[in-house]
Amino acid sequence: MILLNNSERLLALFKSLARSIPESLKVYGSLFHINHGNPFNMEVLVDSWPEYQMVIIRPQKQEMTDDMDSYTNVYRVFSKDPQKSQEVLKNSEIINWKQKLQIQGFQESLGEGIRAAAFSNSVKVEHSRALLFVTEDILKLYATNKSKLGSWAETGHPDDELESETPNFKYAQLNVSYSGLVNDNWKLGMNKRSLRYIKRCLGALPAACMLGPEGVPVSWVTMDPSCEIGMGYSVEKYRRRGNGTRLIMRCMKYLCQKNIPFYGSVLEENQGVIRKTSALGFLEASCQWHQWNCYPQNLVPL
């Protein structure tokens, strides 16, 4: 694999990946953040250049120092020929199979190569999937170097119409001081490693909340290092009031204004969330969201 670290090549890859959306969207979103400051210190690998068949985005080596930190040890993969991915994936120089890790992508056909590579390295694999939701704009996306990541801290004040609809609620940036609150209410979190991950996300990426009458967040949403919107939550006391919907609408408006790509995923059984997501203008993509959680035999969870 070739390490791409030239800004011109990274931009060329970004433009090329746009032609493979939605299948390439997980890698495309990660590359967006790499091209705009690289706050998570990620690196890009391709099998060849300028013609390529496979792209892997992973944290730089100095980031992956905790063998148990699957929030950090994440590999995002896109392949033009997923059936031939096994040889690349089983290479321990590409994937550190001695760690607890995640492999993410929007191609179910990657699974066969991942499972075979994991088996050859004595690693257990657990696969999860969800529906992928995107906007019409991102399906029409054409890459441009005019895209600029704005400062989330400079997002400005809530729209007048939003304030008039919710006089006791205020739209605000979700800053690092609320990391504990987010972690305590994230089903995939609630531990010290997830707290560290959330702090990094809130410190570097777009995140917003609705402050309630008491001045604390009652609804919030964040973004991850691949531009996926997630960790959305509304405090039970303030649910079914439309605050979450208004919050997402405001976030979508901001992200569109700043040319920041975004998308979301919803478990197929969450029909209520699917209906709300569709009502916001999201479309179900032709491919699905996939994640492979990988555990070395000595680190397999009980």
Curated annotation (Swiss-Prot):
It comes from the Eukaryota. GO terms for biological process: glutamine metabolic process. Pfam families: Gly_acyl_tr_C, Gly_acyl_tr_N. It is an enzyme of class 2 (transferase). Coiled coil: none annotated. Keywords: Acyltransferase, Transferase. This is Putative glycine N-acyltransferase-like protein 1B.
